[in-house]
């Protein structure tokens, strides 16, 4: 009997143990990452040929303590390699693990290689050659602290390499993991199996091979035992012949069918080729089809199973599309696949929540470094009076109500951009803005006391409901997460897409960018203030400080201003402001753009203006500014500088976003200025619930 070890992906150990025991293994002991077992030579070949779950079959050769590189060398030499190698066999060493002595795996591999080669030369035998690409023998050494474990990898290449898959494409899951997913899905061979996002077909091919009793090792051309001195070719050929006989019989007797679809025509062609190479191409129908086109191939029965490894995404901006995909799949399952089972494998349990289905079972497994979950569902048969459940029903109802009221108002006002929802319900703590036929969801980061997974699931529900209520495609919904007004967060670069959208605001056209920054280039709550500036600006010289993207300058220019001067510290936003001005036919010397620290420029400027708009940050401590600024502390000093630039009879419109801001009326009076608060006049219906979004004042000489 040989002591052996079968490695596998974490989470599959118990499943592998059961498989090995069915093959005849004894003394099976589960450890993290695999199973120790015992078996004779025939069992070695059977496990290599028939294990659908093992990554490798390893034959341990010995262990040694490693306190120096000499210890490693001598420990390897203690093994009788001349009785392990066939004459002329090539080999390669795979070394993993480090300690205080062996600090480089390549160095460790070199010491092992030297020890093996020297074992031959000392007996005056031809030295074996190294072949790193396709060796006859693969020696594995694992160094854990001071102990090195030395073993012969009888698999050669990993057992997930079945020999049927085109290796040029991306592989989301290995064949061994795919087989485990099929086994855990609850699917019964002989019943229909469908994968609506099949990619290169791995799940379906593994299922078909299992159902037709086709050994996973049948198509492999290279093994790790070809240079092993104890290899028994007779027994191996018997195991191989038995596998071939069983495969022919299984294929001839199998009567059910498999169905695969994917939106990518190239991967479907690859899936067809893979299935043909696996010898089960006739059993699987592959189609180019989007999930939106998914339908039951057997509406009159029998019932089957839908299985898939849907995309999960790693970028925030991909989530709306993925949530919509899962939500659509859930609805399609309920509408067309009553009586069927569904099994999905995913690295995102939150996305699976968007199905709006209750799982009967779930399993955990690792897909490479990713923690994944497989959830199995039974789809109840639908009845005529069944009503589909609404995702985030309270939120959806409020959004629908707001849309009905605000859409009509916005159309009458001649605006395309407005706030549709602003944390109206505390449990749905987001803002939703419309930009033409686009929508932006801004999630306010939940407090640390809120369970992160629950908050994420709630956000996914919000996205699904928003897509449903607004009736927009997922690629026109943008998701952002922000904390409430923290310093320079609004200027944080998020992406590099550079996609701009032309929107209308009253008589102005403005560029917005919904993806690249936390803010979009247009502060919606200042909409009425901008219109007022346009109405006040005819024949006047207009100054816009802390101008952002210059939208106020556009309104002033369109209102007939004699000149506009737009000042901001950011070159990016000044270039954006210039684009906005040009979009409205405003260019030339009458429309100046100045890149400068606004506070510094204000102290040094000696020009005169009739109308000044200033919307400073609540607080700023930018490295590019000479000093810190606090709007509550410094607004009187700011007004003193502004007064110097204000012509007789001129007006300053002063706005800021500080909650609880208190205007120092006495301080202004000492400067000879009066202030009239116009905050309520500048709040539009879409911001009626948030009356502290900003405060706004008209300031004039007394």
From Swiss-Prot:
Domain THUMP: 43-154
Catalysed reactions, as listed in the record: guanosine(2445) in 23S rRNA + S-adenosyl-L-methionine = N(2)-methylguanosine(2445) in 23S rRNA + S-adenosyl-L-homocysteine + H(+); guanosine(2069) in 23S rRNA + S-adenosyl-L-methionine = N(2)-methylguanosine(2069) in 23S rRNA + S-adenosyl-L-homocysteine + H(+)
Keywords: Cytoplasm, Methyltransferase, RNA-binding, rRNA processing, S-adenosyl-L-methionine, Transferase
Example of a GO MF term: 23S rRNA (guanine(2445)-N(2))-methyltransferase activity
PROSITE patterns: THUMP (PS51165), UPF0020 (PS01261)
Primary localisation category: cytoplasm
Subcellular compartments: Cytoplasm
Superkingdom of origin: Bacteria
The UniProt record lists the keyword Zinc: no
EC code(s) of this entry: 2.1.1.173, 2.1.1.264
HAMAP family, sorted: 23SrRNA_methyltr_KL
Protein family membership: Belongs to the methyltransferase superfamily. RlmKL family.
NCBIfam families tied to this protein: PRK11783.1 (NF008748)
Function in brief: Specifically methylates the guanine in position 2445 (m2G2445) and the guanine in position 2069 (m7G2069) of 23S rRNA.
PANTHER family: RIBOSOMAL RNA LARGE SUBUNIT METHYLTRANSFERASE K/L, RIBOSOMAL RNA LARGE SUBUNIT METHYLTRANSFERASE K_L
The protein's name in its UniProt record: Ribosomal RNA large subunit methyltransferase K/L
Organism whose genome encodes this protein: Salmonella gallinarum (strain 287/91 / NCTC 13346)
């Amino acid at each position: 009997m040989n002591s052996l070890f079968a490695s596998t992906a974490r989470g599959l150990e118990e499943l592998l143990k059961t498989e090995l025991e069915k093959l005849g293994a004894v003394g099976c002991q589960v450890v993290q990452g695999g199973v120790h077992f015992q078996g004779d030579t025939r069992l070695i070949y059977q496990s290599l040929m028939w294990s659908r779950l093992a990554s490798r079959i390893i034959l341990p050769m010995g262990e040694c303590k490693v306190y120096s590189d000499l210890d490693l060398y001598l420990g390897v030499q203690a093994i009788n390699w001349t009785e392990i190698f066939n004459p002329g066999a090539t080999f390669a060493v795979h070394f993993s693990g480090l300690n205080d002595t062996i600090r480089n795996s390549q160095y460790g591999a070199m010491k092992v290689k030297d020890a093996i080669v020297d074992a031959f030369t000392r007996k005056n035998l031809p030295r074996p050659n190294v072949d790193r690409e396709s060796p006859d023998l693969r020696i594995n050494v694992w160094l854990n602290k001071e102990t090195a474990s030395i073993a012969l990898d009888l698999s050669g290449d990993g057992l997930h390499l079945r020999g049927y898959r085109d290796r040029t494409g991306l592989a989301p899951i290995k064949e061994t993991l795919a087989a485990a997913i099929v086994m855990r899905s609850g699917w019964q061979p002989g019943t229909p199996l469908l994968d609506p996002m099949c990619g290169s077909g791995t799940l379906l091919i593994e299922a078909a091979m299992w159902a037709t009793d086709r050994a996973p090792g049948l198509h492999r051309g290279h093994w790790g035992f070809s240079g092993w001195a104890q290899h028994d070719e007779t027994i191996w050929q018997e195991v191989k012949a038995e596998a071939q006989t069983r495969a022919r019989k299984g294929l001839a007797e199998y009567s059910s069918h498999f169905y695969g679809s994917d939106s990518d025509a190239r991967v479907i062609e690859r899936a067809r080729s893979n299935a043909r190479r696996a010898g089960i191409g006739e059993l699987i129908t592959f189609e180019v089809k989007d999930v939106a086109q998914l339908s039951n191939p057997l509406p009159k029965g029998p019932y089957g199973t839908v299985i898939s490894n849907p995309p999960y995404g790693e970028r925030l901006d991909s989530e709306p599309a993925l949530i919509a995909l899962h939500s659509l799949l859930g609805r399609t399952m309920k509408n067309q696949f009553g009586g069927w089972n569904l099994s999905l494998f995913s690295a995102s349990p939150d996305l699976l929540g968007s199905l709006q289905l209750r799982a009967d079972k779930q399993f955990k497994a690792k897909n490479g470094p990713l923690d994944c979950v497989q959830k199995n569902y039974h789809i109840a048969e639908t009845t005529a009076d069944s009503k589909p459940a609404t995702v985030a029903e309270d939120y959806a109802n409020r959004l629908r109500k707001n849309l009905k009221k605000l859409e009509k108002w916005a159309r009458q006002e001649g605006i395309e951009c407005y706030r549709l929802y602003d944390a109206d319900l505390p449990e749905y703590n987001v803002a939703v803005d419309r930009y033409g036929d686009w929508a932006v969801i801004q999630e306010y980061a939940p407090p640390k006391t809120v369970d992160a997974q629950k908050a994420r699931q709630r956000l996914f529900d919000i996205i699904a409901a928003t897509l449903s209520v607004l009736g927009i495609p997922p690629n026109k919904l943008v998701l952002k997460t922000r904390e409430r007004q923290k310093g320079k967060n609004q200027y944080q670069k998020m992406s590099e897409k550079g996609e701009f959208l032309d929107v209308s605001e009253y008589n102005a056209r403005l560029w917005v960018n919904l993806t690249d920054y936390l803010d979009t280039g247009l502060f919606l709550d200042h909409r009425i203030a901008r219109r007022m500036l346009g109405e006040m600006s005819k024949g006047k010289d207009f100054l816009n400080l802390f101008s952002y993207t210059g939208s106020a300058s556009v309104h002033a220019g369109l209102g007939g201003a004699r000149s506009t001067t737009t000042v901001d510290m950011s070159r990016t936003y000044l270039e954006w402001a210039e684009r906005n001005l040009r979009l409205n036919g405003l260019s030339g010397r009458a429309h100046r753009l100045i890149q400068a620290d606004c506070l510094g420029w204000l102290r040094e400027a000696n020009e005169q203006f009739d109308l000044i708009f200033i919307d400073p940050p609540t607080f700023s401590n930018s490295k590019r500014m000479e000093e810190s600024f606090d709007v509550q502390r410094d607004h009187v000093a700011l007004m003193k500088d502004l007064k110097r630039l204000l012509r007789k009879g001129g007006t300053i419109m002063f706005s800021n976003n500080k909650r609880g801001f208190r205007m120092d009326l006495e301080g202004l009076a000492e400067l000879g200025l009066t202030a009239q608060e116009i905050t309520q006049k500048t709040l539009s219906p879409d911001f009626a619930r948030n009356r502290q979004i900003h405060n706004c004042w008209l300031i004039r000489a007394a």
